[in-house]
């Protein structure tokens, strides 16, 4: 659960309320996003039980479509998705920490410079928030270099803390006399239009950002006990629990904050807490948000670095990335590289732009990973599968179709950022053929 419950649920409900102005549509988009996530989780669960090696989707794509596709996934996942998400979430952590230490929120940069890439303006600036974000990433790097047991303990602790914070907010809201069920009206729009379809698509992208991380448990499968049994169970029950939790949180937000006011909130969870709990309650909720964001950062290090480690161990990338620390038995080179690159990305300080890259790259490979179930049933029909995908092939094909729609919608609605994501992915190919040539020699 820690891989999914990050900063999104504390940020994106306000943006979704700005796209969809009726509570029924907001509930619908969260349910559909959760169902898609569940379909994907149930699909990936078969792959993780079939091929329970460390590396997750890298291994699935390599066995299904060839080594180059596994490598491209690892590149995208490591340098764009994981590092970009870590940078954005670390900046969010530092921003919320500024509630308790206002001096950390100073917006005057210590240094800055600007440039453009394919017409996209980029500012590199070191402010107090970026400096704290770098320190947080450094701490998470050191924790995970020390070993899976320590990193896993930290993840479990912060998962419990943030779930308790969300549950406390839900209970406080619905037992308060300060809410109003009239805030749920209008429940449904008077008519459906082309503009509403576009808005629903944009809201869905925000929802899927909040559900990001559902595959990460499979990527440390080689280091887990009994992965054939534990991974499918974790995906199924964890995803269902998060769907219910997210729906309850959104209903709680809207119960105390009207939709037209919700869309203008930058700290929706804190604002909801302030209505029913006052300043002290706001402090508690922000403490929960800090636990949530740090737990997500730590979990990404714990699981996501394994894909590039698998590529290094497979000689599809620099062999240094496949090295294991002699004492701690962790992929320390990969973890340190991820920490350094993520820390550098915090200098951009752009949460929204990074999210666009992450969603586009993620769902391209999520769709291919789901297709791997079909391919591997043809290529490996006799290999034992302790778990088989539920409602196959219908749930799998629905998920693949949804991934295709998300890519199309991103290309149409946010074409510039989507093209930048494609270019960044294609940059990986020269490196692949270089390392492949060196290995063959």
What label would you give each PLM region?
Residues 24, 356-357, 361-362, 375, ...:
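A generic transmembrane alpha-helix motif of multi-pass inner-membrane proteins
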Residues 125-128, 320-332, 366-417:
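C-terminal membrane-solvent junction of multi-pass transporters and transport-like membrane proteins
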Residues 126-134, 225-229, 233-246, 263, ...:
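Loop-to-transmembrane helix boundary motifs in multi-pass membrane proteins
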Residues 23, 27, 105-128, 156-286, ...:
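Helix-loop-helix junctions that connect adjacent transmembrane segments
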Residues 128-179, 235-236, 358-368, 395, ...:
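Membrane-interface loop-to-helix entry segments
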Residues 1-24, 37-42, 51-54, 382, ...:
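Membrane-interface "cap" regions at the ends of multi-pass membrane proteins
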Residues 15-18, 30, 37-137, 142-145, ...:
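Hydrophobic transmembrane alpha-helices that form the core helical bundles
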Residues 1, 66-79, 132-134, 194-207, ...:
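Select transmembrane alpha-helical segments in multipass membrane proteins
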